[in-house]
Amino acid sequence: MFDTVCTLPLSADLFSQAIHPNEPVVSVGLSTGHVQTFRLPSEESSDDDDGTASNSSARNGKGHIDTMWRTRRHKGSCRCLGFGVDGEMLYSAGTDGLVKAAKAETGVVENKIAIPLAKDGSVDAPTIIHALSPQTLLLATDSSALHLYDLRIPFSNVSAKPQQTHHPHDDYISSLTPLPPSDTSTSGFSKQWVTTGGTTLAVTDLRRGVMVRSEDQGEELVSSVYIGGLASSGTSRGEKVLVGGSSGVLTLWEKGAWDDQDERIYVQREAGGGEALETLAVVPDELGKGKMVAIGLGSGGVKFVRIGMNKVVSEVMHDETEGVIGLGFDVEGRMVSGGGQVVKVWHEAVGSNDMDVDMAGGKRMFGGDSDDSDDDNDSEDSEQEQRQPVEPQRKRKKNKGKGKRDIIAFADID
């Protein structure tokens, strides 16, 4: 179904990944606190001198992955990344207790926010960051807090306080999925979102706070994504939230009926329990695959489930030892998977059959990053546009088990 266009080695473990909403740009946050932003080669065909169309540079290996900038953004790990809704800003949050807002194009920091401390006075490390609109930034933390920041209010240096704080779950928030705005919305931006935390799902409203929390599901819920345009029947409006569990089960929740799940799909069955469904991403309709979701597994694979049929129809392997913690699709429809010390970019396989299991290992066309010009200081100076040489992929021993809080499944940005 998908073939690897390129494999991009990283200098440290990937903790967070964000995909630009409007350009072929990917940012990664690493265990070392570094943030790096790459521009992917264009998929668009170009005309040769003789007037005939050539294959895209991304497909024939002649393109380059450019490092737009790289810096050590946080002291400690960079746990969360997220682009603003227009892609102009990139928000990062780290175990140093800071949120930093930087220009996506240059990496220059424009604002800093100090995350409120935990009750015992320690750093309340972040788990998710999400720009809901140009005005609202959501930040979830280890203590189960969900902070809302109004981006229109001028910030003093490292002193901004959240406008609201909610606690939709007893445990830390593992995923956050915005719901589409209503038909009567004047802003066009979401004002409600679904979160998972511990064994429950909750819905929170921008103005009214936490509206509903589900029954205990009996297993940890770790990822979520919204999918619309499904067939309507009876009370179903064709809108669902899909939730990935820690035991390999994907549950489907009807929008508006949040008390309990209404369908279950067994994605990864294993003796003694399935593998965690770490991250979810809806396959773009433009690819013509029907209603389908890509699922990044703790075992390193990516499985594709067709909604309606409710069955796994294809699979690719990101890494044989490291789990997938970042997954999404760029503006040109390419899948981007991240986990361990590698990011892979995939395009639709020519002549692929959706019903075949594709275990493509991928071919290395482009290489990764370098630490040569970085120091260990928390510098905000960004390294501009560097071409990446080809480097061999290095296999590493698996050193992170599922369920650790430092491994955050970053959902695709709307």
Swiss-Prot record:
Keywords: Nucleus, Repeat, WD repeat. WD repeats lie at residues 9-48, 73-112, 118-159, 222-263, 319-356. Residues 369-383 have a biased composition (Acidic residues). Transmembrane segments: none annotated. It is found in: Nucleus, Nucleolus. It comes from the Eukaryota. GO terms for cellular component: nucleolus. Residues 394-403 have a biased composition (Basic residues). InterPro entries: WD40/YVTN_repeat-like_dom_sf, WD40_repeat_dom_sf, WDR55_POC1. The keyword Magnesium does not apply. Its main location: nucleus. Residues 39-65, 357-414 are annotated as: Disordered. Belongs to the WD repeat WDR55 family. This is WD repeat-containing protein jip5. The lineage of its organism: Eukaryota, Fungi, Dikarya, Ascomycota, Pezizomycotina. The gene is jip5.
